[in-house]
Amino acid sequence: REIFPGITIHRNFERITDYEQGNPHFFVKEKGVYKKDNFTDEIAAALEIKDGIVVITGCSHPGIMNIIYTIQKRSKKKICGIVGGTHLVEADESRLKKTIAALKEINIEFIAVSHCTGDENLEIIKNAFGKKFIFNCTGNVIKIL
């Protein structure tokens, strides 16, 4: 849904990857019954720039790659950058490696991760992306052209 020219909001992310299955400890109560939360209400923004899309996430509970792949599929544009949470704090080594490989495969220009990535994983992602990595925190200004 376009909220402003060049800015769309997305939700109901497809579960495309086999390694991002969500946290089994989050539940929602529907009609008095608890069930696994699939985070269908989670949103992410897509900003159109000259070369493609910059994705802005909250916490990425559905999985950062599920979010990216869904937005890429819907927009039919290159994902140039990511700003926000990745929810990789609980990711095991296999999932983290697969996520890094997937991000490298789409050839992002920058990744500005923040909360819920985890301190150890921040270092691993920083080492994987070098100058493309930005540690994003409150008050940062990121110039997107």
Residue spans for each PLM region:
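Active-site-proximal loop/helix segment associated with metal-binding centers of metalloenzymes
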Residues: E2-K50
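Cap/insert and terminal regions of metallo-dependent hydrolase folds
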Residues: N38-A44, E48-V55, C59-T138
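Non-globular, low-confidence helical/coil segments that flank catalytic cores
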Residues: R1-P5, G130-L145
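Short, intrinsically disordered/low-complexity patches at protein termini
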Residues: V28, V33-Y34, I79-C80, F135-N136, ...
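Short secondary-structure boundary/hinge segments and terminal tails
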Residues: E20, E90, N121, K143-I144
